[in-house]
Amino acid sequence: MVHYRNRYLNYIRRKPLALLAPITLLVVIYFYFFSAHGFSSNKQKYNYNKKSRGWFYKNRDTVILKDLPKNHISHYDLNKLTASKDALNKREEVLILTPMSKFLPEYWENINKLTYDHSLISLGFIFPRTTQGDDALKELENALKKTKREKRLNFKKITILRQDSNSLQSQLEKDRHAFKVQKERRSMMALARNSLVFSTILPSTSWVLWLDADIVETPVTLIQDLTGHNKPVVSANVHQRFINQDTKQPDIRPYDFNNWVESEEGLKLAASLPDDEIIVEGYSEMVTHRALMAHFYDPKGDPSTEMTLDGVGGGAVMVKADVHRDGAMFPSFPFYHLIETEGFAKMAKRLGYEVYGLPNYLVFHYNE
C-alpha cells in the first residue's frame, strides 16, 4: 500500500469520489451557464427551434416566457389590408387622432354622434405638459367616465399621451395664431402629431382621420364621406359659425387657410428665402396669392366636388394609413419652406401620393 506524506493525497486516494463529485458539479455548472456564450460564434444569432424540455432548460424557459401568451409572435399580412371607398362594408378600421390643449364638450359629443361603427374606431389624444393641458386631460377623462356610465363608450381603443416636447404656454386663439410664433408653434405641433400617429397606428389601421380639438360640428357620416373619395389624402373645408354684425343673423365664414394650391408668387417667394425659413399662409406679412380652398365654397355646389391641393391644414383630414407607413410625417423643420401639416402634404406628394380637398364639404370650427 502506497502511503503519501501529504495527508490530503492519502484522503483522495482512499475516497476519490470526494474530489470527483465537486469537479463534476463545477463542469456541469460551467456548461449550463456559459456554453451558449462560448460557442456562439459557430451558431446563428437567433434560433427559432423549440428548446428541449430537458432538466436544464425547463426552469429557464418558464422564467422567460411565463408572462407571454402562448402564441407570442404575431404575424400580419399588410398585403391583405384594404383602404377603399367602401370602408364600412369592408370593416376597415379608422384611427381618429386629435392633439388637444383644451377640451370642448361639443367636440366630444360630435365624435360620439358619428355613425361609422364605433367598434372599428380607435381614438388617440396627445396633451401638452402645461396647466391647460392638465385641465383638458381631466375634462376628457371625466367625459370618458360619463359616456361609459351611460353605456355609450363603444370605441375599439382609446389612447391618451402626454407630450415629451415643448408647447406654447398660452393656447388663446389670438396668441397661438400670432404671426411671430408660427414657426415655433407649428414645429412643436409637428412633433406632437408625429408622436401621436407613430405611437397609435396599428397593423389593422386602414385610415387615419386627423381631427382638430376645435372641430365641433361635422356631418355624422364624416368618415364614410371622406373615405368614400378613396384618396390618399383628402381634406374637408373648415368654416366657422358667427353672428354677422351687419345682418345680425347667424352666418358662416372661412376659417382654415392652410388648404391651398401653389402659385407662381408662392414659388418665387420660396426661392428667395433662406433654407431655414418657412412660408406661413393666411397672413398679410407673407403674400403668396395662392388659391385658398376656403374661398372656393359654393353653397349650391356638390359636396363631393374635389380639387387638387398642394397644402393642407389639420382641421379634418382623412389619410390612408399606408401614406404614414410609407414615411409621410409632419416635418418639425422647414421642408421646402413648409412645416407641419403643409409640410406633410408636400412630403406625401414627394412620395408619389395625390392630395385633395373638398371645397363644398364643410366642417365647423369652434368660435371663441
From Swiss-Prot:
Q: Where are the transmembrane segments?
A: 16-33
Q: Write down any Gene Ontology CC term.
A: mannan polymerase II complex
Q: What ranges does the Lumenal topological domain annotation cover?
A: 34-368
Q: Which InterPro entries match?
A: Mannan_Polymerase_Subunit, Nucleotide-diphossugar_trans
Q: Transmembrane helix: is it a keyword of this entry?
A: yes
List the molecular function annotations (GO) for this entry.
Answer: alpha-1,6-mannosyltransferase activity; mannosyltransferase activity
Protein known as: Mannan polymerase complex subunit MNN9
The species is Candida albicans (strain SC5314 / ATCC MYA-2876)
